[in-house]
């Protein structure tokens, strides 16, 4: 039996802001429990829902040196889906209205504390992992501290680490002097071949340099980040580590995302009866959002953070043109103010065609996946993307730009061979996107049989966590022996 510890800043169902939480909540329970004892460690945020806090059981506490002070570390645990979750408690660092704040140096101090506390807690918990699986820059100091401070202790000797990059754009950077003072790391670690990047300290870079293996969340993104366009300044380091770098696609939780058992949608359906049943979700959503009730009208869904990365500048450029077509567009998400206001404006201008829900709601997202005919994701870059996997699961055909995980998961429609599970375009160009949407409209309206055959294919593809878990298990066995 091999012991594995997942360390992350969020995880479903305890706390979630994005796709990282889905991975941390789903992957451990899909690993083979006959071979692995997998546990998860998270911060104990004050903003966790009360029902989640009620599940936590106090274990013990201790003090550790951090940022020139003796800091309190409280330990809690909970059982969820047969997995043990541990929580690091410190009210000074983890009391806030949201899991993350907008102050970069405070974030570095909080998650530097978390990284050191994770390692300090292990002997107290009596759990010695063979491997610690770290996620994103918030845990980037775990491999560094392990080598710098803990490796001399017999308990820690030989523990391996994996660093998973969910989005290379976020790296945890700040000036070296402040980071050195907070973390207590010596000058030795702040050189260009270690944590230093352009005269700043970079926590994700530290994790990539010191981890025994590096993964990211799709094979295409693993190749893209070795190039200057996608590499965010770390492409040279990632090329140097390419022997230990692999891309493993995320999956989705089929217990949560399955149209035949989804408690949020008015008309459940499956791969056999979707031709009759799926459309009932569309008419229900049209009524709920005040759109023109027309079951034949093509509905395009968007569920996303409203940011530049997601390609909303392309949509802004052609939205007026698109609204001249026989389509309805339903949007759910929050993000940059200009995009929130843009969708509010179009919802006002084209009230019977466009609905903008500027919020986040699990229930509405499920309703949009089920009701829409197509799902638009024109991302500038997309490490993996979960929304297109959910759309595929619900028989809603994705229209995507060929980048990262979108390229790996959506097979473009080929009318001559009768293959494909969606539509795609290659260049980051608004009119190329519009042409692709209009091509999809043409198939939807004029070749409905082909469209439905594509839905047959999308609903048969397996993007459950089972496949991804097998790939992770291969990597764990490579690092720590089967």
State each model region's role.
Residues 1-482:
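Catalytic cores of nucleotide-sugar-dependent glycosyltransferases that transfer UDP/GDP/TDP-activated
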């Amino acid at each position: 039996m091999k012991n594995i510890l997942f360390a992350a800043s969020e995880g479903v169902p305890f706390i979630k802001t994005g796709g990282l939480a889905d991975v941390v909540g789903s992957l451990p329970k899909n690993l083979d429990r006959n071979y692995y004892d997998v546990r998860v460690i998270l911060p104990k945020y004050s903003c966790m829902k009360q029902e989640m806090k009620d599940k936590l059981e106090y274990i013990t506490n201790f003090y550790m040196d951090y940022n020139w002070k003796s800091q309190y570390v409280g330990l809690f645990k909970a059982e969820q889906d047969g997995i043990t979750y541990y929580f690091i408690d410190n009210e000074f660092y983890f009391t806030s209205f949201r899991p993350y704040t907008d102050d970069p140096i405070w974030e570095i101090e909080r998650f530097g504390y978390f990284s050191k506390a994770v390692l300090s807690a292990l002997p107290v918990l009596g759990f010695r992992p063979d491997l610690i699986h770290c996620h994103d820059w918030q845990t980037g100091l775990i491999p560094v501290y392990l080598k710098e401070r803990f490796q001399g202790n017999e308990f820690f000797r030989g523990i391996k680490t994996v660093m998973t990059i969910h989005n290379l754009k976020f790296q945890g950077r700040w000036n070296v002097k402040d980071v050195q003072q907070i973390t207590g790391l010596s000058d030795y670690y702040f050189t260009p071949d270690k944590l230093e990047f352009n005269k700043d300290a970079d926590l994700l870079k530290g994790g990539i340099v010191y981890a025994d293996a590096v993964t990211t969340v799709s094979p295409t993104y693993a190749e893209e980040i070795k190039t200057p366009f996608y590499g965010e300044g770390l492409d040279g380091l990632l090329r140097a580590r390419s022997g230990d770098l692999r891309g493993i696609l995320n999956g989705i939780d089929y217990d949560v995302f399955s149209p035949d058992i989804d408690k949020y949608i008015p008309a459940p359906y499956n791969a056999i009866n979707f031709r009759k049943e799926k459309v009932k979700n569309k008419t229900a959503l049209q009524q709920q959002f005040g759109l023109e009730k027309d079951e034949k009208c093509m509905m395009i869904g968007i569920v996303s953070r409203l940011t530049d990365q997601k390609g909303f500048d392309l949509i802004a450029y052609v939205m007026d043109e698109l609204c001249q077509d026989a389509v309805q567009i339903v949007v759910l998400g929050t993000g940059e103010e200009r995009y929130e206001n843009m969708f509010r404006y179009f919802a006002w201008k084209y009230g019977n065609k466009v609905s903008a829900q500027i919020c986040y709601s699990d229930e509405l997202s499920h309703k949009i996946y089920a009701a829409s005919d197509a799902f638009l994701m024109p991302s500038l870059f997309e490490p993996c993307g979960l929304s297109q996997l959910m759309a595929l699961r619900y028989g809603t055909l994705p229209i995507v730009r060929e980048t990262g995980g979108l390229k790996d998961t959506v097979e473009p429609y080929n009318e001559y061979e009768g293959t494909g599970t969606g539509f795609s375009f290659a260049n980051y160009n608004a009119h190329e996107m519009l042409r692709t949407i209009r091509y999809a409209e043409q198939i939807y309206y004029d070749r409905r049989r082909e469209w439905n055959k594509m839905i047959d294919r999308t609903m048969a593809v397996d993007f459950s966590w089972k496949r991804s878990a097998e790939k992770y298990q291969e990597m764990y066995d490579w690092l720590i022996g089967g």
